[in-house]
């Protein structure tokens, strides 16, 4: 009888252990992929301090790709972002802000699905497909922000920049340069807006989520742009990868 009881208790204990081991799976098995996406975004917004690193690469229609711009940074007090880019650049690449990027991914999402072959007991991996119209709107805003940064820049070796550094120099040349610079900016702005008006966007993201904490582990966003430039069809791509780390 005692042998039977011990054997039965062993089976019960084993079953309980298995249930506990699978509890993490059951925890997110009851939630849809879109719910998991939403929970990971809201979860990150509630984290007071974390670190991140990654890179952004831009590809042309010819198949050539720019050297990825690497970055790393920290977030404190939920939304105070500090970023360092490779080479000591002081500009944060557009879209790098981790929480804003995740919010955009959620906002654009038309479909989210679990990727079984990439998921395991520790993480759930989602593939998120963006709605083309929403993606075009989000990316138009991102690209306009990038263009606005360019508008505020003056080449370092220009007469205007030299005069800014040396108050004794004549202002005539800087004034002429500034006029030419503004004309070029105006022309570029019109071309840029014409490009945006024809732009279509396809974007997919891969998000790895900690199954226990429901926090993002990594994100990869792949986006393809098709548009017209000077009346000719053009295509570009952009890939941004971010890994999250709690200190």
PLM region spans:
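Mixed-charge, low-complexity intrinsically disordered segments
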Residues: 129-199
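Intrinsic-disorder-associated interaction segments
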Residues: 11, 29-30, 94, 170, ...
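Short C-terminal domain-edge/linker segments immediately following a structured domain
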Residues: 82-87, 155-165, 237-240
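N-terminal leader/targeting segments and the immediate start of mature chains
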Residues: 2-59
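Acidic, serine/threonine-rich low-complexity disordered tracts
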Residues: 189-247
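An acidic-aromatic
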Residues: 54-140
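Edge/loop elements at the starts and ends of beta-strands within beta-rich repeat scaffolds
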Residues: 42-50, 119-121, 198, 211-217
């Amino acid at each position: 009888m005692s042998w039977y009881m011990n054997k039965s208790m062993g089976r019960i204990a084993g079953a309980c252990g298995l249930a506990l081991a699978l509890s993490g799976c059951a925890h997110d098995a009851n939630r849809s992929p879109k719910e998991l996406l939403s929970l990971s975004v809201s979860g990150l917004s509630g984290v007071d301090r974390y670190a991140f690193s990654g890179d952004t690469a831009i590809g042309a229609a010819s198949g050539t790709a720019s050297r990825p711009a690497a970055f790393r940074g920290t977030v404190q007090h939920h939304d105070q972002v500090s970023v360092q880019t490779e080479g000591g650049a002081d500009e944060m690449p557009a879209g790098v802000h981790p929480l804003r990027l995740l919010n955009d991914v959620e906002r654009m999402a038309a479909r989210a699905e679990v990727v079984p072959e990439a998921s395991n007991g520790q993480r759930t991996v989602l593939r998120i497909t963006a709605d083309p119209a929403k993606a075009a709107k989000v990316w138009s805003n991102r690209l306009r922000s990038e263009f606005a940064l360019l508008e505020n820049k003056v080449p370092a070796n220009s007469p205007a920049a030299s005069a800014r550094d040396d108050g004794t120099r004549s202002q005539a040349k800087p004034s002429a340069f500034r006029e030419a610079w503004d004309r070029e900016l105006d022309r570029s702005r019109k071309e840029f807006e014409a490009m945006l008006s024809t732009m279509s966007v396809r974007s997919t993201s891969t998000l790895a989520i900690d199954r226990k904490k429901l926090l993002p582990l990594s994100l990869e966003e792949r986006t393809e742009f098709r548009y017209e430039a000077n009346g000719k069809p053009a295509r570009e791509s952009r890939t941004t990868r971010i890994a999250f780390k709690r200190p």
